[in-house]
Regions:
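Walker A (P-loop) phosphate-binding motif
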Residues: 1-26
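Residue-level preference for the first positions of well-ordered beta-strands
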Residues: 3-5, 28-30, 162-165
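P-loop NTPase switch/communication element
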Residues: 39-58, 121-123
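Iron-sulfur cluster-binding cysteine motifs and their immediate structural context
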Residues: 73-90, 99-115
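Conserved catalytic-core segment of NTP-binding enzymes
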Residues: 106, 112-121, 143, 147-230
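Flexible beta-alpha connector loops of hexameric P-loop NTPases
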Residues: 133-142, 194
Length: 230
């Protein structure tokens, strides 16, 4: 099975348009949208959701006031100042480190897992697709990218398809690293601008670091023929 990941050093280069074009031509493939922070492949694929599941990751502490003795130990130990004078934990400040849970003498602090988003298996006009949506301001997008890629492989195995086309996230951060690890190849979509070239060079270095074969597609090539030639 081959897995081709389309990535770019910056947003707006047109990689979703390119992968939609490839999807319309390729056969026996599964589509995968790994840009979970700003998924948009569904805009051109017109998916009909067949199944959906919650994505859970990380924890946020919550104090049960009925058991809390207000001893102040949790407020003293919290390095993120997430606990106010009324012993209420601000979920925006809580980093989920768990120190309040561990040291609370009354065992009054719950530590539920966060629901960060959803992932989907859909049928599209191009064929089956696995995609996801991370919640607003939620973290751990790299873990969701990994989950989406794993589910795409399972779906390809079930349907006996030999190609996965993945729309990866832009940039060079954690989500991109999660999207290219172990891939057969990456196609870097860039544009003929100074920022486009600079960001392309960074993502090429990233692909080389993980020993993933890289190819380059210069989209909107006629914007600057000189830079395209370079």
């Amino acid at each position: 099975m081959k897995e081709l990941i389309l990535i770019s050093g910056k947003g707006g280069t047109g990689k979703t348009s390119i992968i939609a074009a490839l999807a319309s031509l390729a056969e026996n493939k599964v589509l995968c949208d790994a840009d979970v922070d700003a998924a948009d492949l569904h805009l051109v694929a017109n998916p009909q959701v067949l199944s959906r599941a919650e994505f859970r990751s990380g924890h946020t502490a919550a104090i049960r006031k009925s058991k809390c003795s207000e001893c102040g130990l949790c407020r003293e130990l919290c390095r993120y100042s997430a606990i106010d004078a009324d012993y209420h934990i601000n979920p925006l400040d809580c980093e989920g480190c768990g120190v309040c849970v561990y040291f609370c003498p009354e065992k009054a602090v719950d530590f539920p897992e966060n629901t960060c988003g959803e992932w989907f298996i859909s049928d599209t006009r191009f064929g089956p697709m696995v995609h996801a949506q991370l919640g607003i301001a939620e973290e751990n997008s790299g873990k969701l990218v990994t989950l989406v890629r794993q589910e795409a492989r399972k779906l390809a195995d079930e349907k006996k398809h030999d190609l996965i086309l993945t729309d990866g996230p832009p940039g060079v951060g954690c989500p991109v690293i999660a999207s290219i690890g172990g891939a057969s190849a990456v196609l870097i979509v860039t544009e003929p601008s100074l920022s486009g070239i600079h960001d392309m060079q960074r993502v090429i270095e990233l692909a080389n670091h993980f020993k993933v074969p890289a190819m380059v597609c210069v989209n909107k090539f006629d914007l600057n023929p000189d830079l395209t030639a370079d």
